[in-house]
Amino acid sequence: MKCSYTVVFLLFYLLIASFHVDALSWAAWSPWSSCTKTCGGGVSRQLRRCLTSKCSGESVRFKVCAQKTCESKSRLARDTICGGEEIVSRGQCEVVCRSRLTGANFLWRVDDGTPCQAATSRAVCSKGSCQIVGCDGLISSSFRFDACGVCGGRGDTCDNGKFIWKVSEEYTACASNCDDIVDWSGAGRSIASTSQPIVVCVNAITGRVVPEKLCADKLRPKVEARPCPMLICPSRCRWMAADWTECVPHCGEGTRKREVYCVQTAHNVTVHVPDTFCENGTRPAAEENCVSTSCGRWEAGKWSKCTASCGQGVRRRHVACVGGSDCDEGGRPRQETTCYAGIPCSIATNSLDWNDRAYLDGNTFGSMDNHNDWQAPRLVAGEWSTCSSTCGTGVMSRTVECVAVNPISSAPIKLPMSECQDQEQPKLFESCEVRSCPLQEDSKLSEDEAPYQWRYGDWTQCSASCLGGKQKAALKCIQVSTGKSVQWSQCDARRRPPEKSRPCNQHPCPPFWLTSKYSDCSMSCGSGTARRSVKCAQTVSKTDGADAHIVLRDDRCHFKKPQETETCNVVACPATWVTAQWTECSRSCDSGERRRQVWCEIRDSRGKTQRRPDVECDANTKPQTVEVCSFGSCSRPELLSNRVFEQNAEQKKLTLGIGGVATLYQGTSIKIKCPAKKFDKKKIYWKKNGKKIKNDAHIKVSANGNLRVFHARMEDAGVYECFTDRLQGNVTLNFKYRDFPASRVDLAPKPQIPSTKNRQRVQVSKEDVLREQASVLHKMNVSLIEALLTAPNDEKAREQLRKYGNELVARWDIGHWSECRQKTCHVAGYQARGISCKVTFHGEIRNVDNSICESLASVRPPETRPCHREDCPRWEASQWSECSSQRCVSSMLAQKRRNVTCRFTNGTSVDIQHCDITNRPATTMDCPNQNCKAEWRTSDWGSCSSECGTGGVQLRLLSCVWISSGRPAGRNCEQMRRPHSARACVADEPLPPCMPTASALYQRDASCQDQSRFCDIIKLFHSCDSLEVRQKCCSTCTFVERKKF
């Protein structure tokens, strides 16, 4: 009955304790610890202590910190966590590694605070799993932003006036290397793009970022992008060739040329880059041979008759380009020439003013005394009449008169024809043809005899100013007699020549300034700036697209560069808040604060600013003036002392100070004091081997800042550091083993432990305890033995149990050590074994909970221990070779060598991947060597290229070599005088003269002659491909070409 009463009472006690309010069970939260990182995502921790035996909830909570992206680009923690070992699987927060030596797998957790990807929310890694981060910054928090941007709100406090757009100081990322370039069509982030400022919607009062929909009713600010540096990626560079020029010469075999560029295309813009970036590709030919089939030549017809019957006239002929349309205008034969009729024109017949009656009247002449003063009569022909036929052959006529001239008045006098009968009479009729008759197919007039002929006139303007255009010769119909242009209908359409054109302006286009459209204005008010791209470019192809132009350096354009910016939105702005730069952090390490000034300012239409009273700006949008800053943990001091402490085997508890090294027995309880003065000791924290210590039943930091370790184990060995606002000192603990004898129950009186505050003590009567104890000892009920040994410390109960003390024995049952397990080299392995607690009473042995042995003051043996440590392989380098015998690399400088291998301490060689490749010693090193001198070496002169005459040439080989070894020395002879590699033939006796050949006889009267004394080299190499060679060695090349056939 009393036993049942006891059980009911215990259950009632547990039920009452479970209803204690958490606020009374927990102490206040500690201050936040410093962030585990300074950038890239870390965590900060906060602790609270349970004041009662039963507390619900967590004793530690975490928040994210240092979320700013690190400036220096580093590899992801998931990629480096295995420390060079093989990565078997890579989770977001856990990575499985495999030892390259043993093949064993082991699990590593990613650092807490490392960002990870959750389904819908922001998340970070915590304790090996991806945990949601609440809007309050706490990991695993259930707080979220509501529709109004309030953290943990209910969506009923929206005020759109509180939310504004804000241009952050962060920009979108530029491509930092060629692997980041994801789109070469211009749509993605590519080579020389721009970086945009990030615009976010924020709560104007708190400054927190909120969903963008809360700023949907406000105009999003226009931002000004900044250009990204251009990346030149050799793997994406290519050769680009311009269009070919026309074949030169225009008839027969010749050459044509084109420009070849190394380019890189981005955003539909082709940029000219140095040729070295295209070395992996095949460079297109810049020159090639060609054959032009358009070989026009001039042909001239017969001269026409002289147009004058006396004095000087004109003769004309037809000149045409046949066999093509590219005849050289400079070599065009003359189409007109002067001619002489053979009879001087002493009288201007066109001015004769006839008056037959007056001058033939005898009375007129009769009055003159001297008839001898008259000139002798002569026949004078008049102008030809028009042709009797408008087309085809006709007749034209003229009159012939006998006249004389009075030498005094110079007036002509018409005489009877009989006065001139002794003179030869000129023709009175002549055949003529105005034009060919179109319907008269059987016309026998040649083209040269036609009165109207087709002629080519001046060239039209070139169709292009560069890169090769076309121009045409204007076709005209000319009246042969006058040389004037008439309508085309006057010329024979059947004889109309083909259209004639020629290439023109084949030179490259000059560089020019290529401009884009202006961007949007950088300011919505207050005089902003619009920008555009202005680049020096050159057109290299007539095709459209990115390959039509290449971008050059600005100094290649000789005209004034157009402006890249222009002023826009010249209107005044309303008053707004302006912030100054943040001050320096108040602390150089750990957490501090920094401040900045904030004032109200207006910007006028000209862009000038003026401070205004704060009341003119919106107080709800005023930026913060103070914020927290952190620059990582404070620097470490050196070890405070070199004290060495060795524990005495009789000691069970020890108190140590900071400094030195202590070697202790396992199982010892330790207290280490932190020498902090004038500091809040509740804020003291400890680290073991660089990792912050978390309180538990085995190890904890007390309220006064001291570190306590209960029943120390072998794995507790390490370096312990004490921190306030900086490192105060450290101590190194090592442990050694001791024997583990069986422990008997100590039933001696012990001082009563005072009860904890708010904890009730269960009262048990003497008779109940004796009855329960007798049942336990006789029936060996393990559960009741545990209840007896953990019962309240009642003096009367202990007196009743004292008589059984010698018969109740508790001891540890210890198993065998396992094989040594070692995850990786340079880290000690470990061995494990099983332990269990056994109680012996009246000869009977039972396995019981381990807590029974521990409660009997028996030291618990360690379940693990360190084992042999296998060192990592290391680099071993041999001695350097002698510099004097090594290969020369430049003048007075050689390169010595040595072997570098990866070996274990026992001398075993392994693959180099097992050693740290970043610390591999150099295998080569430059060293001074006086023997490293280069010189030109020549071979003997070769035989003469000619067996006769004086134009022969001798050749020899040149090579730059090291004097000491005779090996090739590359370009190390460039500063020395280069010996001649060719000379005119030198012989003891002059060579006999060459016999004339058919080729020589053929060229004897021609202008094709050799102009260089080295033309005989062509006979050795049979190379006349170059136009310059053919011009300077015309005779030799003719001989070579004839010899081929």
UniProtKB/Swiss-Prot annotation:
SUPFAM superfamilies: Immunoglobulin (SSF48726), TSP-1 type 1 repeat (SSF82895)
GO CC, one annotated term: axon
Superkingdom of the organism of origin: Eukaryota
UniProt note on tissues of expression: Isoform a: Expressed in the commissural GABAergic and cholinergic motor neurons in the first larval stage but only in the cholinergic motor neurons in later larval stages and in adult animals. At the L1 larval stage, mainly localized at the nerve ring and at the dorsal cord. Isoform b: Expressed in the commissural GABAergic and cholinergic motor neurons whose cell bodies reside in the ventral nerve cord and which extend axons into the ventral and dorsal nerve cord.
Keyword annotations of the record: Cell projection, Disulfide bond, Extracellular matrix, Glycoprotein, Immunoglobulin domain, Repeat, Secreted, Signal, Synapse
Location of the TSP type-1 domain: 24-71, 236-292, 294-510, 512-572, 576-635, 811-873, 932-990
SMART domains in alphabetical order: IG, IGc2, TSP1
Range of residues in the leader sequence: 1-23
Pfam families, sorted: Ig_3 (PF13927), TSP1_ADAMTS (PF19030), TSP_1 (PF00090)
Sites where a glycan is attached: N268, N280, N730, N781, N899, N906
Result of knocking out the encoding gene: Disrupts the clustering of the cholinergic receptor subunits unc-29, unc-38 and acr-16 and the GABAergic receptor subunit unc-49 at postsynaptic domains of neuromuscular junctions (NMJs), and the receptors are redistributed to extrasynaptic areas. Loss of neuroligin receptor nlg-1 and netrin receptor unc-40 localization to NMJs. Isoform a and isoform c: Defects in AChR localization to cholinergic synapses. Decreased AChR-dependent currents triggered by motoneuron stimulation. Isoform b: Extensive dorsal muscle arm extension defects and weaker ventral muscle arm extension defects.
Ranges where the PLAC domain occurs: 1004-1041
One GO molecular-function entry: signaling receptor binding
Localization per record: Cell projection, Axon; Secreted; Synapse; Secreted, Extracellular space, Extracellular matrix
Span of domain Ig-like C2-type: 637-732
Cystine residue pairs: C35-C65, C39-C70, C50-C55, C674-C722
Presence of the UniProt keyword Transcription regulation in the record: no
Gene Ontology terms: biological process: dorsal/ventral axon guidance; extracellular matrix organization; synapse organization
Role of this protein: Component of an extracellular matrix cue that is involved in the guidance of dorsoventral midline migrations and in the specification of postsynaptic domains at neuromuscular junctions (NMJs). Acts as a ligand for the netrin receptor unc-40 and the neuroligin receptor nlg-1. Secreted by the dorsal and ventral nerve cords to attract sensory axons and muscle membrane extensions called muscle arms. In parallel with unc-6 and slt-1, involved in the netrin receptor unc-40 dependent guidance of the AVM and PVM mechanosensory axons along the dorsal-ventral axis. Isoform a and isoform c: Promotes the clustering of acetylcholine receptors (AChR) at excitatory cholinergic synapses of NMJs via the netrin receptor unc-40.
Quaternary assembly: Interacts with eva-1 (via the SUEL-type lectin domain). Interacts with unc-5. Interacts with unc-40; the interaction is required for the localization of unc-40 to postsynaptic domains. Isoform a forms homodimers and heterodimers with isoform b. Isoform b forms homodimers and heterodimers with isoform a. Isoform b interacts with nlg-1 (via extracellular domain); the interaction is required for nlg-1 localization to postsynaptic domains. Isoform b interacts (via the Ig-like C2-type domain) with nrx-1 (via C-terminus).
Domain notes: The Ig-like C2-type domain is required for the attraction of the muscle arm extensions.
Protein name (Swiss-Prot/TrEMBL): Protein madd-4
Upper taxonomic lineage: Eukaryota, Metazoa, Ecdysozoa, Nematoda, Chromadorea
Gene name in the database record: madd-4
